[in-house]
Amino acid sequence: MTTETGPDSEVKKAQEETPQQPEAAAAVTTPVTPAGHSHPETNSNEKHLTQQDTRPAEQSLDMDDKDYSEADGLSERTTPSKAQKSPQKIAKKFKSAICRVTLLDASEYECEVEKHGRGQVLFDLVCEHLNLLEKDYFGLTFCDADSQKNWLDPSKEIKKQIRSSPWNFAFTVKFYPPDPAQLTEDITRYYLCLQLRADIITGRLPCSFVTHALLGSYAVQAELGDYDAEEHVGNYVSELRFAPNQTRELEERIMELHKTYRGMTPGEAEIHFLENAKKLSMYGVDLHHAKDSEGIDIMLGVCANGLLIYRDRLRINRFAWPKILKISYKRSNFYIKIRPGEYEQFESTIGFKLPNHRSAKRLWKVCIEHHTFFRLVSPEPPPKGFLVMGSKFRYSGRTQAQTRQASALIDRPAPFFERSSSKRYTMSRSLDGAEFSRPASVSENHDAGPEGDKREDDAESGGRRSEAEEGEVRTPTKIKELKPEQETTPRHKQEFLDKPEDVLLKHQASINELKRTLKEPNSKLIHRDRDWDRERRLPSSPASPSPKGTPEKASERAGLREGSEEKVKPPRPRAPESDMGDEDQDQERDAVFLKDNHLAIERKCSSITVSSTSSLEAEVDFTVIGDYHGGAFEDFSRSLPELDRDKSDSETEGLVFAQDLKGPSSQEDESGGLEDSPDRGACSTPEMPQFESVKAETMTVSSLAIRKKIEPEAMLQSRVSAADSTQVDGGTPMVKDFMTTPPCITTETISTTMENSLKSGKGAAAMIPGPQTVATEIRSLSPIIGKDVLTSTYGATAETLSTSTTTHVTKTVKGGFSETRIEKRIIITGDEDVDQDQALALAIKEAKLQHPDMLVTKAVVYRETDPSPEERDKKPQES
């Protein structure tokens, strides 16, 4: 390399300075040219040109794209006077590129952008075309050579980000708002609804059948308006897409719900749509393929709350943003440094293997952007300095806090936009047999793995809260429609209407679910109801439970709270006893009182939002429901004078209700494995060892006995029988019944079980089965609270069926984070045929309702027709 001196160098300096000034002037006159672009590249490129004049041919390849003043510098060595013509040549050489953007309604928008324009220029043009002001939740995506989705960086030149010749982009939601109700404008919610509908159809957002129907009905109401019998004839929703695997049954359910939304505006329908969609477990989760340290395929999901880890479509861990100290990547490895826990001294680093370096960087960028947008008040400035280790990338847009402040300042009339009859997701797109898909620039290839498989498993493992949403996704309109079907006293009606709105929605959803089941002609519940009625009419069973205590609701929904008691209130005229009406009224009053106390607990619980894996303590205790206070239990004692007299030796001050998170059926049977309750509690204590395995095995006392449980969220109904002062009727046991043929109940007493599982797991009351005709009460002093705990067993006698349940809970702790696996084995034996499909469905539904934050990953059914040797030996003895 040579250094030039003398007058020639001065001429060159003049040549270098003169082209820069016109170029800067051209940048000002062209609105899409980014400011400050010409200086760094011009200086560096010109340095190469002045020092290496022997390579003009090599440099000429980049002239069109990088700097157009360089050619002038070469031609002006002998004739500097020609420099005056260079500005005209520069203005002509500035080229523009055609950008095609696929919008959320599948339409295309074309615009012309200067070739050196930054991503923000194109994004602003698209938002202006859409008349969108709350644009910080959205972004533009493009596909690279590997067909991977990438976010367009608004602070960098488009030309440096997209290498392919056609500039195709997709306008999508980048940050899903945790509470869509906080969006200011209807048009913003409309585009968010379009994005969620695309997510549902492509399988990225799994839903249950009930959720598909509900969200689909709101989408129809928003686009078609009120149901019109003349206009909407036949299957008028068959042309629209609502689910990956759409069935005729789903379309009929959507039309049935659509008819009930008369008077609901499109904006209100979209709000209801978003309020239900945000509860889905995969809402706003951006998935990326990865492998853990052992080489097992996993998925890393980034959302507003943190980083989620999925394996085999099951979420196995969650790292909340406050728990993460540092996010980094090196080559194809992605690392997160975890804040030490309460009992740890050092930080721990967890590494994941990504497919390649680009994937690791892409995931790192997504994490940086989500953390900055949702957690920080203002974006962090990029690091400054000549030598900076690592990437300088930082999120440069507005944070959610800044977006809300800006949205509050929006002062314009609501923009007009047309919700056209949906041509976006129509069945005609799949007439060729291919499944519907958005354009290639929109499809998210890095997250299509497990979610594609989830479409087949929606009924079982579509989402951790999909079943729980069935009790939350109804609207007041539906309540008005079905309210005349409920026969209640005026006093009870007023109490019911005083409940909060969420309780009303849960109540209505429970009734709707139960009604659909009871309408089936082959429903086992109808036969069971008849058996209970027959037992009630028998004179030999004066203390048999009334229809309100039947297990028909228990076998249908464990989430059925006060709604189950409402459903079966109509009196049965077949009862011959003259005093049955008085007993029903007493039962009703007691049940109403107990229901009110329980609802207070549920309202208290609904405000507890604890992450199951954000820390060790949170995961262990995230299912604590609440507790009764002394006043509530005193009223409970007054409503049960017989029990109050029996407990005179020690006054019970409080009763703690807790849901045992570790064993979904360890609470279920009280006949065996009862001494394991301290072990079961130890599994819930924060001071747990690194690995614990808890096994609670319960066996029946005889082939005639079936032990059942009452879950903590069950609505308790109790009454005192005049025939026996120690007999207490069990109310509505909210468990799934694993028998398909209803047993004929012959016992005279069903005792109520209230299992106490304290938050720390210590001092749980032991359950000792007493005689089947007498309720056995046990009091155990809690070392934590210092209160007596009232417990009793619940026994029922069947004729020919017996059930054995084995629960195996494995909890592995690694680095302060735990992984819980629950295996449950249910054996049903008896002479009568058992409908294994019914039993399996009930078992899965019970497991989901007990553990809404966990997924059912595997269900295996074995059927043996021959009876076991023990049963052969027992049958002669029973006869």
UniProtKB/Swiss-Prot annotation:
The modification Phosphotyrosine is found at residue 343. The modification Phosphoserine is found at residues 75, 378, 430, 437, 461, 466, 510, 540-541, 544, 546, 564, 578, 639, 648, 650, 665-666, 671, 677, 684, 721, 782, 868. The modification Phosphothreonine is found at residues 30, 79, 475, 550, 685. GO terms for molecular function: actin binding; structural molecule activity. Residues 38-50, 444-501, 514-538, 550-577 have a biased composition (Basic and acidic residues). Residues 76-87 have a biased composition (Polar residues). Highest expression in brain, also present in kidney, olfactory epithelium, retina, sensory ganglia, gastrointestinal tract (only enteric neurons) and lung. InterPro entries: Band_4.1_C (IPR008379), Band_41_domain (IPR019749), Ez/rad/moesin-like (IPR000798), FA (IPR014847), FERM/acyl-CoA-bd_prot_sf (IPR014352), FERM_2 (IPR035963), FERM_central (IPR019748), FERM_CS (IPR019747). It comes from the Eukaryota. One of its GO terms (biological process) is regulation of exocytic insertion of neurotransmitter receptor to postsynaptic membrane. Residues 381-482 are annotated as: Hydrophilic. The keyword Cytoplasm applies. Keywords: Actin-binding, Cytoplasm, Cytoskeleton, Phosphoprotein. Residues 483-541 are annotated as: Spectrin--actin-binding. Residues 1-88, 428-501, 514-594, 657-696 are annotated as: Disordered. The keyword Phosphoprotein applies. It is found in: Cytoplasm, Cytoskeleton. Residues 97-378 form the FERM domain. Residues 17-35 have a biased composition (Low complexity). SUPFAM superfamilies: PH domain-like (SSF50729), Second domain of FERM (SSF47031), Ubiquitin-like (SSF54236). Transmembrane segments: none annotated. Residues 743-879 are annotated as: C-terminal (CTD). One of its GO terms (cellular component) is cytosol. May function to confer stability and plasticity to neuronal membrane via multiple interactions, including the spectrin-actin-based cytoskeleton, integral membrane channels and membrane-associated guanylate kinases. Interacts with AGAP2. This is Band 4.1-like protein 1. The lineage of its organism: Eukaryota, Metazoa, Chordata, Craniata, Vertebrata.
